[in-house]
Amino acid sequence: MNNIKLIAVLIFVVGCSSESPQSKFESLLDSEWSKIVNDNPVYASSMGDLSQNTEWSDTSVENIYSDHQHQLDVLSQLDELDISDFSDDNKVNYLLFKQQYENSIESHAYKTFLIPFSHRGGIQLQHETTSIVPFRNKQHYLDWIERISKIDVLVDAAIEKGKIGIAEEIVPPRFLMQKVYKQIELQAFVKPKDSPFYRTFLEMDRSINKIETEEIQKKALNVIKSKVIPAYVKLHRFFKDEYLPACRTPIGIKEIKNGKEYYEFLARKFTTTNLTPKEIHEIGLAEVARIRDEMNAIINEVKWDGTFKSFLDDLRTNPKFYYETSEELFESYLATSKRIDPELVKLFKVLPSMPYGLKPIPMESAPDTTTAYYQRPAADGSRAGYYYVNLYRPEVRPKYEIEVLSVHEAMPGHHLQIALAMELDLPNFRKYGGITAFVEGWGLYSERLGYDLGLYKDPYSRFGQLTYDMWRAIRLVVDTGMHYFDWSRQDAINYFLDNSAKTKQDVMNEVDRYINWPGQALAYKIGQLKILELRAKAESELGDNFDIKDFHHEVLKRGALPLDILEEYINQWIEEESN
C-alpha cells in the first residue's frame, strides 16, 4: 500500500515538473484573470458573473500595496519562463501581458493612486454603476440595495487615500475638486426619494409585481437614508474642512513629486511609442497647421466674407446649426446611426453580432463631462453596447458634429472594434482589455471613413469632420503644454478656441478632462496617424490588389495591439499579398 502511494506521489511530481513553459504561462493567464474578476465585483457583475453582486472592490491603501507586491511576484514568474518554444500567438500574448504588469508597477512608484477623486467619475457618482449591472429580477434589486448599504466602506477608503495624499503632497488641482465638491452635495443634501441612488427603483423590471416593488422601494429608501446619505455627508465634510484647502493651484501633473518623469512615462504608455512629450508637441503643431489649411479651403468654398475667427464664431453662435431641445438632438443622433449601419458592408468583411443602443449621459455628470462616450457590451451578451451622448445645453451641441461623433463612438468606431474583439479567440485580458492608442486611434481613423459611408455631403459636415480631427491634433499640443511645459488652463482654452469650431462649453470640459487625465489624450492622434500610415503603405505597394475590406480585417482581427506590433503584422500581410 505504501509503495502504491509513493508511486502516485512520484507520478504527480513528475507530471508537475514536466509542465511546459507555455502551459505555465497559459495557467498564469487564467489565474490572473480570475483574480481580476474576483477583486472587482462590479466589473464581474457587468460581465455577467453575479457571485459577488452585493460587494464593492477593496480600494484601501493596504490592498493597493498588496496588489503591487502580487504584480511584482507575477513579473518574476514571467521572467523565469523560456518563451522560445511558444507559439507565435503566445509570444505576442506574453509580450502584451508582461507590458501590462510592467506599466502598472512603474506607475505605482509615482503614487497617483493617492488621488482618488475625479470630476468625471468615482465615489461621488457611484450611482451611475447601475448602467452596467443587471436589474432583471427581484434579487438583482435586493443585491443592489445590499451593495449600496456598504457605500461607507468606499467613502472611508477614498478619505484614507486623500489624507495620505495631503501628507505626501500628492493632490489634484483645486478647481477640479470644486466640481467634485458640488457633485458630492447632490448626494449629501437630498431627500431619500430625490437621491440619484433611488432613480433605478422608480421604473423597475415588469416581472416584479406591485407588492414586491413597494417592498423593495421601501428597503431602498431606508438604506439611502441610513447609510448612503450619511456617508456622503461625511465625505462632504472631509472635502470642505481638509481636502479642498490642501489641493494644489497649478494644473500640470509636473507639479507633483517627479511629475515630469511621470508624464514622460504616461506619454510612452498611452501612445505605445518612445516619443517624448516634446516630439509629440511638435507633431501636434504640424497637424494643426495641416488641418487648418484644409479648413481654410472649405471656408473659401462657402465664400465666407470674413476671417477664420469670424467663421468659427458664426459656427458657434448661429442658431441654424443647433437644435432647440434635447429631444430633437437625441432624435438626430438616432437617425444618423440608422443611416450609417446599412453602409458598413462596403468597408468590412465581418461585423459584430452584438447590437448597440444610444442613451443620454446622466444629468448629474452631463454639465461637467464631454460630448459623448461608449460603453462596451456585457461579456455574457445580456447588455448591448451603448453610445452615450451629452444632451445638456443643446444650444452648444452643433448639428455638423453629429455624423463624425457617431462614426467614432459607435459604428464603425468603438462599437465595431470592441464588440468584434470580444468575439475573438483571445485570452481574456486582451478580449476585454484595451490599448488606448489602438482603440482611440481606430476611433479617430473611423471618422474619415464617414466619406465612404455617404456622410459629410455638405461643406459644414465636412468642416465638422475636420473640427474633430483638429480637436485631436490640438490635444497633442495642449496636453503636453499643460502637463510638461508651462501652459495655463486659459492658454489651452485660447489655443483650442483659436483653431477649432468647438463651442466654449465643450472646450472648457475638454481641457478640464486633460488636466484630470494626463497623457490619455495623446493616444488618439498618434494611433490614427499610424493606421493611416499603414493604409497608405498598403495602397502604394499593393496597387490594384489593395482591398479596403481586407486591410480593415487585418487591422482588427487580433484585437487591440501596441502600434509597433500592429505595424509588424500589417507589413507581413503586405508582403504576403504582394507575393
List where the protein language model places each region.
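Hydrophobic h-region of N-terminal signal peptides that target proteins for export
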Residues: L10-S18
